[in-house]
A protein has these predicted regions:
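Conserved SAM/AdoMet-binding glycine-rich loop
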Residues: 50-196, 200
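Short, charge-patterned binding micro-sites
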Residues: 204-206, 434-467
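Radical SAM enzyme core and accessory elements
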Residues: 234-392
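N-terminal pre-triad scaffold of radical SAM enzymes
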Residues: 2-26, 53, 94, 116, ...
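Flexible glycine/acidic-rich beta-alpha junction loops that bind and position SAM and/or redox cofactors
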Residues: 72-73, 102-106, 128-133, 163-171, ...
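Ordered, amphipathic secondary-structure segments that act as subunit-interaction surfaces
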Residues: 461-513
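Core RNA-modification/binding signature centered on pseudouridine synthases
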Residues: 395-398, 413-414, 419-421, 526-636
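Canonical Radical SAM [4Fe-4S] cluster-binding loop centered on the CxxxCxxC motif
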Residues: 7-43, 365-378
Length: 636
């Protein structure tokens, strides 16, 4: 598969182990649309992960399913993968799991050399509301799962809850607080339990039993405040709430009809996007509501904001059957699940009746299984293989190779951290015996001399790699280059003694080439007086000479804590000269800069020179193309 050069949200290898879910959670659209459930053969999963990790170079992999814990072969597959990949320093993560199926066998296969967090989804704080949801989870099972997690070293657990469910009362909302308090108290003998809560607002989804129910935004805000007040005295709990405005838009779009197509386009054109990001919330909400009003759908939107559909009220008045007969915009779509069955299941929900999982118990007659869509496929679990003793990645340092490399073209647009990840994955794919650091989070022993600013090409950079076994330098260069883009070119390689000081201690100077262009008709920076006449070669030469002859070049910036500071940069300026212009570059001036670099990596950047030259010339300047042409080391 394709491996991106930049960090993505789910930056790991992902392999599907089970498609479909028959748990029957009544709010869950994927669980209704993907029936029946079908397990993947365990050996196929193992082969896909093993080959995928070797071909991609990822250090993490995830086994994907709507309910991973219902894949009965998970313990056997997990142990076998840990055994086969023990020497590769990789970690296994799983999505949100069924806490009632979380046991020691699953806890032992999670993580690896690194341990990720655990996420469970009780959904509701009382047994009655969990039965309405058809969660199939008891308080005892929740406590047992949390205690198992703590016994295996997990003292921080993430829990998902939902408010606004059909039939919910204030007692159910406060039950979330009681559940968290009870878990902390009953696990106190195992240590301090830290809980991260995500409180989502229920939004109905088509093709689910809860598609006929909604809650007003006013009621959501009241219930959120009720929770905030009740959780405030508790320690060790962090809580995130979903923006009510986002939930209202999600409800409207999720249950809309074909009239929404122009609304979606108009909202996007008005600036909607990344709607769930807090910095985008105000802009996105304004874009969506404006697009809805412009389409003449504001009345429908406000009706949903006020809780236009309430299955609980219809159930209380005995009108639920007629209420569920109303036509819906998606009735013409056949998901495989009968609409009549969804209405019946809504009635069962409001009566707090539970429907068992048909993958492991009797058929619930939802209408899916048959000759067209098939039946549930549940593969009996193979025996769990004996786990091999844990093996730390090779940390011996036998040899060190120093590479000169160039980073050009589109790769100049990836960050320094992304460059390090790119190199690490290329090393893993190459199969070279790289040496890892020790400790809780082992990493390949690689060092890049000096980070390149984003957007800057580097024509002669330095990279040190330590290996756990002898490696021929040229063979290592060829194998590593085969796993890299041509835009990250390994120019040369040489063996250096392990006792050689690190690259950061050996850098003496950096050579830059950059272009500057005057910006006419702009106010000049203070204190120089404005001068919009042409910047002649003589004025350029005089400006460069003035900087080289200056005794002080102060630079104001901020430290890591955001406090203003002033640095003296004159000692870093070694040389500055004009490059004879090429044809066609009439307005641009190309400069060569040599700047000293100290042991902490402090130096000059072309942007510093742009600022000072603007002041000397009395003319605003724009920085053009920038290259770092060479890093000079002590040995160069």
């Amino acid at each position: 598969g394709l491996v991106p050069h930049i960090e993505t949200v789910h930056d790991r290898l992902t392999v599907e182990i089970r498609r479909g879910c028959t748990r029957g959670c009544r709010f869950c659209q994927p669980g209704m649309l993907t029936r029946p459930a079908r397990d993947v053969e365990p050996e196929a999963v193992i082969e896909a992960v093993e080959e995928g990790m070797l071909r991609t170079g990822y250090s993490d992999f995830s086994l994907l399913s709507l309910s991973c814990s219902d894949y009965l072969s998970l313990p056997a597959v997990g142990v076998e993968l840990r055994n086969r990949l023990a020497e590769h320093n990789v970690s296994l993560t799983l999505p949100s799991q069924r806490v009632d199926r979380f046991d020691t066998s699953i806890a032992h296969i999670l993580g690896g050399t690194r341990r990720a967090g655990l996420t469970f989804a009780p959904e509701a704080g009382t047994q009655r509301l969990r039965d309405i949801v058809n969660k199939g989870l008891t308080d005892e099972e929740l406590l047992r799962g949390i205690r198992t997690a703590m016994e295996n070293g997990y003292n921080r657990v993430k829990l998902y809850f939902m408010i606004g469910l059909p039939g919910e009362t204030d007692a159910d909302v406060l039950g979330i607080v009681d559940t968290c308090r009870g878990l902390q108290q009953q696990c106190r003998d195992l240590g301090r339990l830290q809980l991260n809560l995500t409180i989502s607002n229920f939004t109905p989804k088509p093709h689910t039993p809860f598609q006929w129910h909604s809650v007003s935004t006013t009621e959501f805000r009241r219930r959120q405040q009720l929770l905030r007040d009740a959780l405030r005295p508790l320690r060790g709990i962090k809580t995130n709430y979903t923006d009510v405005r986002l939930s209202a838009v999600e409800d409207f779009v999720g249950r809309g009809d074909r009239r929404l197509a122009p609304v979606i386009e108009a909202a996007w054109r008005a600036g909607a996007g990344l709607d769930a990001w807090f910095e985008s919330a105000d802009r996105s909400h304004a874009a969506w509501t404006g697009a809805i009003e412009d389409a003449g759908l504001g009345g429908s939107y406000r009706a949903l904001e006020m809780g236009g559909w309430s299955a609980a009220e219809a159930f209380a008045t005995g009108d639920l059957e007629d209420f569920c007969r109303q036509p819906l915009p998606w009735d013409h779509i056949d998901s495989g699940v009968d609409k009549a069955w969804l209405a019946e299941d809504l009635g069962r929900a409001l009566a707090a009746a539970v429907v068992p999982d048909c993958s492991f118990e009797g058929c619930s007659s939802c209408g899916v299984c048959g000759p067209e869509l098939g039946h549930n496929v549940v593969i009996p679990p193979p025996p769990v293989p004996p786990p091999l003793p844990p093996r730390a990645p090779a940390s011996e340092r036998v040899c060190r190779l120093r590479f000169a490399f160039a980073k050009t073209g589109s790769l100049a647009l990836i960050s320094h951290l992304d460059t390090l990840r790119l190199l690490e994955r290329a090393l893993r794919r190459s199969g070279l015996p790289v040496s890892f650091t020790g400790g809780f989070h082992p990493l390949p022993r690689l060092q890049v001399a000096l980070p390149l600013p984003l957007g800057v090409e580097g024509l002669h950079e330095w990279l040190d790699l330590d290996f756990a076994a002898p490696v021929d330098p040229e063979t290592a260069r060829e194998r590593l280059q085969a796993e890299l883009s041509p835009e990250l070119l390994l120019l040369s390689v040489q063996a250096v003694p392990l006792a050689t000081p690190g690259l950061a201690q050996q850098i003496r100077s950096a050579q830059w080439r950059f272009s500057l262009r005057p910006v006419p008709d702009q106010p000049a920076p203070e204190p120089a007086a404005p001068d919009h006449s042409a910047v002649t070669p003589e004025r350029w030469a005089a400006a460069l000479a003035a900087l080289l002859e200056a005794t002080s070049l102060p630079w104001q910036d901020k430290d890591k804590k955001g406090r203003p500071r002033e640095r003296e940069c004159r000692p870093y300026l070694l040389d500055l000269r004009l490059v004879p212009p090429d044809r066609g570059l009439v307005a641009d001036r190309v400069l060569d800069l040599e700047a000293a670099v100290d042991s902490a990596g402090r130096s000059l950047r072309p942007d510093h020179l742009r600022h000072w030259l603007s002041e000397v010339l009395g003319q605003p300047l724009v920085l053009g193309a920038v290259q770092r042409r060479c890093l000079r080391l002590d040995a160069c």
